[in-house]
Amino acid sequence: MKQRITLEDLTGLTEYQRDRLNDLWDPQRYDVAAGFLCMDAENNKYDVFEFVVGHVNIRETRAGYHMTLINLEALRSIKEQEDSAEEEENAEEINFDEFNEDDFTFEYERPDIYNKSDCIPLLTIGQMFDILKKCGYGNGGFYADFNKERNEAGVGRDIEQFIDFGMDFMDEELCNALWEAVKDTL
């Protein structure tokens, strides 16, 4: 069973839908997200990275709040670097006058910190239910159904439709049916 949407699922979203989804998302630790890094502003080309949120940093600004998301892998590597730096400090003194070009790499690297506005969540089934509820899908009276015998899942807006087995969105995967409902509400 598919547990969350994928990067491919995000490709069909309009810019308005991406912005709306970002606004509805309250990032939490261990959420999976897609981070977008502008590679060519003139041609509107972006590199997309899938990452796990390790930390959410919220800062108050004049205009409201600014949220940054730190990649879980980056948190782990920062901790490892701090530990090794302490060991090096205790082992010997570093001579900063010696410069070696091999000490630095100027290659493109995946970012460790993302602005929330540059990210889109790869929603889980539970997060999609939350978004449908926030958006008032079916005036709060929506339902999901999974028929194992027919290998069908669906989402509907009106409980009266459920009696007649009417579904707004159907798919073999509940995740895909919910995603179609979420896209419809965005």
Where are these regions (language model features)?
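Glycine-rich anion-binding surface patch
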Residues: 1-186
